[in-house]
Regions:
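Intrinsic structural disorder/low-complexity segments
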Residues: 15-16, 36, 72, 94
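Short, flexible beta-strand-to-coil junctions
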Residues: 12-19, 31-32, 54-62
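Short, mixed-charge low-complexity intrinsically disordered segments
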Residues: 42-98
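Intrinsically disordered, low-complexity repeat segments enriched in small/polar residues
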Residues: 5-8, 33, 38, 63, ...
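Surface-exposed flexible segments
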Residues: 19-34, 66-75
Length: 98
């Protein structure tokens, strides 16, 4: 199967910090940067009980079926699915702190 490289945008909310362990909840995943920024701004304007939000751009190398699953079912995927990502580059784009 052919592999592709795509930029995927994640919005993650920091739920808990204990020492070097950070627990995050993924709030949004999309391949459209503009849409990700709009959702990030909307979520950042709301008051939450978290430590903050981060909008990150991941450059990922994978087969088309991997991207399909990631973009369509991101909220229901097991943690092991994310551990298999081949990340080419990571870049935080925006961050809020509580």
């Amino acid at each position: 199967m052919k592999e592709y490289i795509k930029n995927i945008y994640f919005i993650e909310e920091t739920q808990n910090i204990e020492g070097s362990y950070i627990e995050v909840k993924t709030r949004f995943v999309n391949e459209d940067k503009t849409k990700a920024l709009d959702i990030y701004k909307k979520l950042a304007s709301k008051k939450t009980n978290s430590f903050g939000l981060i909008l990150s751009e991941y450059k990922i190398k994978a087969e088309e079926s991997y991207f399909y699953q990631l973009l369509k079912r991101w909220s229901k995927l097991p943690a092991d699915f994310y551990r298999k990502m081949q990340i080419i580059n990571y870049q935080p784009l925006a961050e809020t702190h509580a």
